[in-house]
Amino acid sequence: MRDDRALNVTSEIGRLKTVLLHRPGEEIENLTPDLLDRLLFDDIPYLKVAREEHDAFAQTLREAGVEVLYLEVLAAEAIETSDEVKQQFISEFIDEAGVESERLKEALIEYFNSFSDNKSMVDKMMAGVRKEELKDYHRESLYDQVNNVYPFVCDPMPNLYFTRDPFATIGHGITLNHMRTDTRNRETIFAKYIFRHHPRFEGKDVPFWFNRDEKTSLEGGDELILSKEVLAVGISQRTDSASVEKLARKLLYYPDTSFKTVLAFKIPVSRAFMHLDTVFTQVDYDKFTVHPGIVGPLEVYAITKDPEKDVQLIAVEECDTLENILKKYLKRDIELIKCGGGDEIIAAREQWNDGSNTLAIAPGEVVVYSRNYVTNEILEKKGIKLHVIPSSELSRGRGGPRCMSMPLIREDL
């Protein structure tokens, strides 16, 4: 890793040095049964316990020597750089919240500027703003009178503790993602300001392989770095094939890149298989956890540079098993460890609770949810060192340790 680079991730398993998390906040308390579909949740976590579980996750990482950063803290620090940046951030946040009334926009600008510090303001933006919190705003316009039933003027962002999805570190750059839904796409504004204005990243060599103003969707849970030369991307419920091509073109043709191939995995379109990292993750040099439903013949496309046409790509279908595809591109024998031991019922249950969604701290050393005890026992028997974290509430959001973390720096293998 070069000294002038703030990011470095060239594998899924290199020793983790720096990671970005978001501690669940009041946005979780603003979930109601009527809002679950709109805000992409299946259940309502108990915030007190969810925070305790998340704190245990963060402490596990720290004890393993990982520097833990928080999204909300970096975002607040990024807009400290100047009042102009802060006002631009507030204005953009309000626009992306879907606020149409000019008077309401003015009231929100005044409200956000009333906070004594930027961290409190960012926390409130993430938590959502209820109408009654704008005490001096008089709802007299047609817009306000017609829309007087819905409780929020700015929706809460309960998915924020899944920091993997809004952006993804690849090599020394990032994909600043355009998420599938408006609900989640709003989350990417924080990363935008962090990477443009935070002193940790401003002026550093941080190329954007994909940007949030694209029209097609890409989410970080579909991006897995198999090696310094091979990136896997899922074509899924949340990521479009067109986005994979855009990412591949930018990444493969960048002058200073080690990546040579992008593997596009077409995975089932369902809630259980939402992202590629919900169906397989790497736990060691030669070992992957995997849902049994994806080990058969797969539709995978190997994307490389066209040697005859400038800035063009070649996509070749690789119709084979997951094991053989990984063996071919990683140039080693591969062992797939089935979630739930391959038992149909156990696999379905533990897959629902992200049994295949592990976070590697180092080769052969991973963080897992306690509730997936069958898969965990199998991993231990395979020689994998486990850091087991409590998960009764965090798992209600349908994401595991990998989903809840965005590595910024890993050691190269």
From Swiss-Prot:
Q: Which GO terms describe its cellular component?
A: cytoplasm
Record keywords: Signal included? Answer: no
Question: Which InterPro entries did the record assign?
Answer: Arg_deiminase
Q: What family does this belong to? A: Belongs to the arginine deiminase family.
Q: In terms of one coarse class, where is the protein primarily found?
A: cytoplasm
* Catalysed conversion reaction: L-arginine + H2O = L-citrulline + NH4(+)
Q: In which pathway does it act?
A: Amino-acid degradation; L-arginine degradation via ADI pathway; carbamoyl phosphate from L-arginine: step 1/2
Keywords assigned by UniProt, alphabetized: Arginine metabolism, Cytoplasm, Hydrolase
Superkingdom assignment: Bacteria
Query: What are the catalytic residues?
Result: C403
State one molecular function term (GO). Answer: arginine deiminase activity
List locations, semicolon-separated: Cytoplasm
EC number(s) on record? 3.5.3.6
Q: Which gene encodes it?
A: arcA
This protein's name: Arginine deiminase
User: What processes does the entry annotate via GO biological process terms?
Assistant: arginine catabolic process to ornithine; arginine deiminase pathway
